[in-house]
């Protein structure tokens, strides 16, 4: 459902979303509709909020002068029925306690990023703040409409957010000519389609007299009562009186301003009003203009204004009227304030009237019983249909339950098998754990034994090193002693040879030469590998000198 917005104001604005103003002459008097006073005429204020690169938008207030805001509903054709929506949405009936900052907080930072411009239209009437939102893309429009349509403004108050798709915004200036009197703002998008240049073909949405809001059957429920006045269903529920709010007000005004008179002769007594068209005429005891109205129009029901009794010209008798009591809800007869012009006090007439009243009561009772029978039969048929649907659902649920039970049994058997396998694995795990503990204990014992052996080996290695050093030192001592022994043996053998040789002059003047210690030591190492040789005694001639 799409809507068309028309703003008729004094101050010209070229574009409502850019607020480029032109010079406007001062308007004197009522330029909206000539001499006819428009009760909706009032001052219109425009609050502009744009979203530039900065995060916080600037709020500018512009006065459009006195004017009227019209909202029309557009019925799209079949070819344009499934077109994508435009880029403009309208929020109706924003509460007065919400400031522009509250509106921004209600919209949220996420949606404000996808909005280019926000315009708030304020009028003098309460709850008449309308917000126009222009978005950057159609996806944001659809997402915003889905999320915010029907959303409550706050958790305390019952007001809800009503979001509408606006296809076109038209601004009219009554002081200019018809060709240049309006500045139209047309959306560019797949849903844009041409509109008529004039608005007589469009139907403006009516206003509820209780809450002063637009009445749209696609948004809220509407109810039309007997007097053909239409209201919002919640508004009529809040109205405590049983009478119509409009009729009650208009009847009070009429009764205070003037007195009812016959429309033909202006007679102000014994008046009868037609229940079909509301014509007032005098009774048959004056000029019988009420009956003449029945002859001319065939409107057979007329009510006497003094006694509130209804006369049937076709049946030539009074209509029996029953009212529902407000206390217990029973049907009671309408009481009369006085006798009518055709009432007689004779017992025959009273008996005849009682018979007619009884017959009418019987007819009413029969008709009510018939309507109740039809109602309860339809109710029983609905209940039987519901019962059949419930039985079908029960059969389906029984099948589903049986299948679920079979699946549950299968799952239980699988669970039992899995539990037995799990138990076996637990036993095996326990055995492996005990073996692991035993091996760990053996490992600890072997580890302690290895540590002890390692300490012992280190001690033995130290002892071995010490013994090796001792052996080396003793070997040196042995070598030294061997050298000394060799020298001693050499000396002894030499002395013996000398003694054998006798007292010769060569031996007396000779010199004994001994080898160095270093040579002896090096030769001692080689002597370990070779056989020990007998020392050679040098000749006395080579080693001894003469005096």
Swiss-Prot record:
Top-level taxon: Eukaryota
Biased segments, Basic residues type: 526-535
ZnF RING-type: positions: 208-248
UniProt keywords, alphabetically: Cytoplasm, Metal-binding, Zinc, Zinc-finger
GO process terms (BP): protein ubiquitination; Ras protein signal transduction; regulation of signaling
CDD domains: RING-H2_BRAP2, RRM_ETP1
Alphabetical list of PANTHER family matching this protein: BRCA1-ASSOCIATED PROTEIN (PTHR24007:SF7)
Descriptive protein name: RING finger protein ETP1 homolog
């Amino acid at each position: 459902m799409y809507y068309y917005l028309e703003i008729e104001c004094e101050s010209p604005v070229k574009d409502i979303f850019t607020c480029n103003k032109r010079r406007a002459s001062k308007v004197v008097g009522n330029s909206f509709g000539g001499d006819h006073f428009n009760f909706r005429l009032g001052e219109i204020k425009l609050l502009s909020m744009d979203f530039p690169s900065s995060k916080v938008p600037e709020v500018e207030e512009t006065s459009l002068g006195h004017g009227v805001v019209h909202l029309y509903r557009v019925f799209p054709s079949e070819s344009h029925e499934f077109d994508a929506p435009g880029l403009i949405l309208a929020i109706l009936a924003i509460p007065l306690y919400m400031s522009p900052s509250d509106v921004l907080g209600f919209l949220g930072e996420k949606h404000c990023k996808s909005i280019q411009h926000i315009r708030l239209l304020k009028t003098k009437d309460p709850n008449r703040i309308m917000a126009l939102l222009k978005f950057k893309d159609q996806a944001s429009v659809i997402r915003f409409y889905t999320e915010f349509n029907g959303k409550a403004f706050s958790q305390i108050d019952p007001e809800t957010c009503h979001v509408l798709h606006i296809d076109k915004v038209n601004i009219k200036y009554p002081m200019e000519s018809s060709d240049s009197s309006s500045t139209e703002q047309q959306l560019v998008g797949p849903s844009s389609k041409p509109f008529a240049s004039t608005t007589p073909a469009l139907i403006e949405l009516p206003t509820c007299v209780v809450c002063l809001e637009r009445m749209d059957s696609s948004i809220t429920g509407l109810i039309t009562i007997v007097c053909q006045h239409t209201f919002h269903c919640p508004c009529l529920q809040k109205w405590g009186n049983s009478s119509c709010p409009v009729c009650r007000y208009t009847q009070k005004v009429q009764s205070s301003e003037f007195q009812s008179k016959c429309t033909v002769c202006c007679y102000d007594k014994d008046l009868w009003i037609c229940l079909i068209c509301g014509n007032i005429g005098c009774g048959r005891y004056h000029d019988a203009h009420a009956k003449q109205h029945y002859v001319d129009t065939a409107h057979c029901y007329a009510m006497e204004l003094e006694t509130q009794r209804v006369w049937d010209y076709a049946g030539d008798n009074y209509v029996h009227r029953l009212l529902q009591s407000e206390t217990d809800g029973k049907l009671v007869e309408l009481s009369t304030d006085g006798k009518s012009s055709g009432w007689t006090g004779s017992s025959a007439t009273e008996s005849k009237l009682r018979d007619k009243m009884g017959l009418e009561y019987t007819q009413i009772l029969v008709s009510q019983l018939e309507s109740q029978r039809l109602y309860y039969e339809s109710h029983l048929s609905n209940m039987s249909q519901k019962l059949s649907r419930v039985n079908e659902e029960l059969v389906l649920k029984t099948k589903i339950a049986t299948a679920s039970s079979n699946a549950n049994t299968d799952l239980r058997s699988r669970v039992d098998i899995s539990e037995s396998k799990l138990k076996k694995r637990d036993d095996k795990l326990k055995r492996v754990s005990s073996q692991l503990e035993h091996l760990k204990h053996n490992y600890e014992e072997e580890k302690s034994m290895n540590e002890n052996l390692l300490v012992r080996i280190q001690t033995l290695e130290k002892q071995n090193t010490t013994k090796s050093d001792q052996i080396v030192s003793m070997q040196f001592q042995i070598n030294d002693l061997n050298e000394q022994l060799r020298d001693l043996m050499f000396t002894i053998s030499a002395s013996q040879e000398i003694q054998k040789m006798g007292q010769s002059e060569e031996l007396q003047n000779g010199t004994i030469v001994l080898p160095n210690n270093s040579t002896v030591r090096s030769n001692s190492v080689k002597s370990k590998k070779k056989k020990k040789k007998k020392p050679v005694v040098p000749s006395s001639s080579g080693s001894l000198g003469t005096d």
